[in-house]
């Protein structure tokens, strides 16, 4: 088999890893809709889904069947090409961003030297998806929702990036594996970069448009915002894309601030690395759901004021202090 060169083997393994990670993330995003409803029911002293299968475990299958058989309707007054393109970008950009997440020491799709920058590039594409959805729907509520979402996402992505610059300054690299290795050799970044962690988790909730930062799709004000004209699988792609965003931000929180796959007993039980990563990611996913269950939605102007009046000073102070400490250590 002379044709099976080392380069070809590397390509095949990368493709297989990408497919496995892609399917796992999509399945996790879909399952999260059931998990969220069960947890919300538990915290609100009610049952949640409990009719389809034991503990409502087959509710996801019922929802998928319903979604598949709904009419894939495109409004006659919409820009059909852009209307169809928007959910593809919304879901696809977040799936591609998962390529830079190192799940275990040996498992990950891409080991990029610009890993964090690649994440910001893919996250920035979701703004286009929201804008395309609102503009192409030719609906005033959809347009208002997309304008809200664009302003909110662009604002909070600034602080999402600034909150990680302290980590980059300490490690001296944008590579995700280098960041995890630095935490293994020294200390998890939740301690020296606590203010960066606080800003990142707030901005992460905002850019995923999760409650209490779900003003772009506020049902009471905008009748579901930029989703309003979508139905069937197009709406389903937006829906699953939102949960994929939650999984992505949770995985980044675990990787950047809590050591990723790092934990005790890895020398004797290396398979625990995946368990540690999954447990840390699952904790932050539950935190996202708990935030939705416990906090009220503020006004839109309060959300934007909070970003520039609270998050901006916090991230700048964190970055300046980190820079000063790095320079002092280098002397």
UniProtKB/Swiss-Prot annotation:
Keywords assigned: Cell inner membrane, Cell membrane, Membrane, NAD, Quinone, Translocase, Transmembrane, Transmembrane helix, Ubiquinone
GO biological process: aerobic respiration
EC number in record: 7.1.1.-
Ranges that cross the membrane: 7-27, 81-101, 114-134, 154-174, 187-207, 238-258, 271-291, 310-330
Pfam families, per the entry: NADHdh
InterPro entries: NADH_UbQ_OxRdtase_su1/FPO, NADH_UbQ_OxRdtase_su1_CS
Record's keyword annotation contains Cell inner membrane: yes
Protein's cellular compartments: Cell inner membrane
Its membrane topology: Multi-pass membrane protein
Principal localisation: membrane
Catalytic activity: a quinone + NADH + 5 H(+)(in) = a quinol + NAD(+) + 4 H(+)(out)
MF terms (GO), sorted A to Z: oxidoreductase activity, acting on NAD(P)H, quinone or similar compound as acceptor; quinone binding
Family from the record: Belongs to the complex I subunit 1 family.
NCBIfam families in the cross-refs: PRK06076.1-1, PRK06076.1-2
Protein purpose: NDH-1 shuttles electrons from NADH, via FMN and iron-sulfur (Fe-S) centers, to quinones in the respiratory chain. The immediate electron acceptor for the enzyme in this species is believed to be ubiquinone. Couples the redox reaction to proton translocation (for every two electrons transferred, four hydrogen ions are translocated across the cytoplasmic membrane), and thus conserves the redox energy in a proton gradient. This subunit may bind ubiquinone.
Subunit annotation: NDH-1 is composed of 13 different subunits. Subunits NuoA, H, J, K, L, M, N constitute the membrane sector of the complex.
Protein name (database record): NADH-quinone oxidoreductase subunit H
Species name: Pseudomonas aeruginosa (strain ATCC 15692 / DSM 22644 / CIP 104116 / JCM 14847 / LMG 12228 / 1C / PRS 101 / PAO1)
Organism taxonomic ancestry: Bacteria, Pseudomonadati, Pseudomonadota, Gammaproteobacteria, Pseudomonadales
Recorded name of the encoding gene: nuoH
């Amino acid at each position: 088999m002379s044709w099976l060169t080392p380069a070809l083997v590397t390509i095949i393994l990368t493709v297989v890893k990408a497919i496995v990670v892609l399917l796992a993330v999509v399945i996790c995003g879909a399952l999260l809709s059931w998990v969220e409803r069960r947890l919300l029911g538990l915290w609100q002293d009610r049952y949640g889904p409990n009719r389809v299968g034991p503990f409502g475990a087959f509710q996801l299958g019922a929802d998928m069947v319903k979604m598949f058989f709904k009419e894939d309707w495109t409004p006659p007054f919409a820009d059909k090409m852009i209307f169809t393109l928007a959910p593809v970008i919304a879901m696809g950009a977040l799936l591609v961003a998962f390529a830079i997440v190192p799940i275990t020491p040996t498992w990950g799709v891409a080991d990029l030297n610009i890993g964090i920058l690649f994440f910001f590039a893919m996250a920035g594409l979701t703004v286009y998806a929201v804008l395309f959805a609102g503009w192409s729907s030719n609906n005033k509520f959809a347009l208002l929702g997309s304008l809200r979402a664009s302003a909110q996402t662009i604002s909070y992505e600034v602080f999402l990036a600034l909150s990680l610059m302290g980590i980059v300054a300490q490690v001296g690299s944008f590579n995700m594996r280098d960041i995890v290795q630095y935490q293994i050799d020294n200390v998890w970044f939740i301690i020296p970069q606590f203010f960066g962690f606080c800003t990142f988790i707030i901005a992460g909730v905002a850019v995923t448009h999760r409650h209490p930062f779900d003003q772009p799709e506020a049902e009471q004000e905008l009748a579901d915002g930029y989703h309003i004209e979508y139905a069937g699988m197009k709406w389903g792609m937006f829906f699953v894309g939102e949960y994929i965003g939650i999984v992505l931000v949770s995985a980044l929180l675990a990787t950047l601030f809590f050591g990723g796959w790092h934990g005790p007993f890895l020398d004797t039980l290396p398979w625990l690395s995946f368990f540690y990563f999954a447990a840390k990611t699952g904790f932050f996913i539950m935190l996202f759901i708990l935030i939705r269950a416990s906090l009220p939605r503020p006004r839109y102007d309060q959300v934007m004021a909070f970003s520039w009046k609270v998050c901006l000073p916090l991230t700048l102070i964190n970055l300046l202090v980190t820079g000063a400490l790095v320079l002092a250590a280098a002397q």
